[in-house]
Structure formats: structure tokens, C-alpha cells
């Protein structure tokens, strides 16, 4: 059961509560439509639309105030998702510069339908974007198109969790809306594609340390914290780089932060 219950527009929430809401929606995006609809309605959304076109998947969660696009992330059992992740060649973006070809291809599949829905339904609503893993990359490209390639009413913010690098420097610097980019310690997906290929991150890094607590750190401090997390994972018999990518881990840690609490450091 999710903890958020909207009683007013999303914009009325502070960044902690918004981060939790979008983490929960990014997790809900992995569910089948019946279950996702039930979960989304428990959060305060009245209508749910599921896009599933040639293996590319996303949800639209909507109420009278807000329009949320939540893109589904990589599912290990779906060959289409794995193929998209691996197709890391750069290709020309619809807006500016270059993006990851596999991620763009997934967005291209759902974009015509999504574009129509935005033009029809979003005129009086605030638009938000979120996603985890592959879904984070897709949400980033969708947000860029919504505000860069056509007149998109009322765009608000982008929330990504465990996002890979999506585009080249000029693309990410042209990102037109506020982006909160959540990174859980050693999450391996946040390290690919390699920066040597020209790909870059952008947005405000929201870093969860070894114990899952939000911290502002320098690059050197993050390096030491990642080494600490890796060693802690070894002692617990797990591979930290993979376990840190779990969406449920993001949700539970952000929930504590939103409540003004922290995980114990042990």
C-alpha cells in the first residue's frame, strides 16, 4: 500500500513529498493495468491510460489538476527492453544534439499517441514526468519533446530514479524543466552509457548514500561512500551495484526522507 494520498494539486506538495509520489508512480508503472489502476486511484488519480506499443510501455495518471507520464523501466524478461538498453549508438534527437538510439526508439513508438493525449487532455492540467531505469531515460526524452518540439501547456518537473545517461552535453543542457535525478549509491545503471561515448547526466543529483540517506556530497566524498557501500554489500553477500538499482529501495529510502527520518548507519 502506498503512503501518498493527493488532496490538492501536486504542486502544493514540497519536494520531499513530490519525490515520494513520483517514486511510487515509477514503481506502479511496472504493474499490469488492473493493478496499476487500483494503486494509482489509491493515490488520488481518477483516470489511468496504459500505452503498450511494440514493447514500449508507459502510463498516464490523471485527475482534475494533474497529468503524469510515468514510463516503464527495463524488465529482464522482455527482450525488447534489453535490446533498447544495448543499442547505445548516438542518434539525432528530435529537439537538439544526440541521444541514445535505443531509448529514442522506445519513445518514438509511443510518441504519436502520447502527443495526441497531451494536446487533448493536458490543456488545463499541470504535466509531470517520471520513470525508473529505461523508463527514466524515456521520461527524459518525452519531457524534452513536450517542451522543445511543440507548444506543451503547463509542464512542471521531471523525476528520474536510477537513470542511465541519455544524451550528449548539448541535449542535457537544453533540458527545459526542473529535473530531480535520484541516484542510489552504487546503482550500476547510472554509470552507463560511458561518458567516453559523449553521454552526460544532467539535473539536480539527489544522492542516497550507503545507508540510503539523502546527502549532498563532493565527488571525492561520493567515491569514498561508493567504496563503503560496495564493501558493505560484499559483507552482506550481495552485489551492491545491482541491488542498489531496485525501485523498491528508492521508494523505501525516499519515504523515510519525506517523513524526516533516516536509516541507521550500521
What is the predicted function of each stretch?
Residues 1-130, 134-266:
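Non-catalytic, mobile gating and regulatory segments of ester bond hydrolases
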Amino acid at each position: 500500500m502506498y503512503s501518498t494520498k493527493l488532496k490538492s494539486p501536486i504542486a502544493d506538495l514540497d519536494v520531499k513529498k513530490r519525490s515520494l509520489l513520483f517514486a511510487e508512480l515509477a514503481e506502479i508503472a511496472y504493474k499490469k493495468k488492473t493493478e496499476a489502476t487500483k494503486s494509482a486511484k489509491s493515490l488520488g488519480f481518477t483516470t489511468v491510460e496504459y500505452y503498450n506499443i511494440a514493447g514500449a510501455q508507459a502510463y498516464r495518471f490523471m485527475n482534475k489538476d494533474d497529468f503524469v507520464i510515468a514510463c516503464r523501466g527495463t524488465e529482464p524478461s522482455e527482450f525488447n527492453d534489453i535490446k533498447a538498453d544495448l543499442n547505445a549508438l548516438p542518434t539525432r534527437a528530435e529537439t537538439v544534439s544526440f541521444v541514445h538510439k535505443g531509448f529514442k526508439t522506445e519513445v518514438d513508438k509511443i510518441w504519436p499517441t502520447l502527443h495526441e493525449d497531451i494536446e487533448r487532455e493536458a490543456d488545463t492540467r499541470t504535466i509531470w514526468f517520471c520513470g525508473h531505469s529505461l523508463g527514466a531515460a524515456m521520461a527524459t526524452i518525452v519531457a524534452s519533446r513536450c517542451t522543445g518540439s511543440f507548444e506543451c501547456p503547463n509542464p512542471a518537473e521531471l523525476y528520474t530514479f536510477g537513470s542511465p545517461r541519455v544524451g550528449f552535453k548539448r541535449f542535457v543542457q537544453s533540458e527545459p524543466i526542473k529535473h530531480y535525478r535520484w541516484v542510489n549509491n552504487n546503482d550500476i545503471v547510472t554509470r552507463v552509457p560511458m561518458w567516453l561515448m559523449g553521454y552526460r547526466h544532467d539535473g539536480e543529483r539527489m544522492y542516497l548514500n550507503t545507508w540510503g540517506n539523502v546527502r549532498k556530497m563532493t565527488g571525492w566524498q561520493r567515491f569514498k561512500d561508493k567504496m563503503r557501500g560496495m564493501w558493505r554489500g560484499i559483507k552482506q553477500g550481495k552485489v551492491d551495484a545491482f541491488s542498489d538499482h531496485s525501485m523498491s529501495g528508492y521508494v523505501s529510502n525516499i519515504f523515510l526522507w519525506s517523513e524526516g527520518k533516516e536509516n541507521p548507519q550500521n
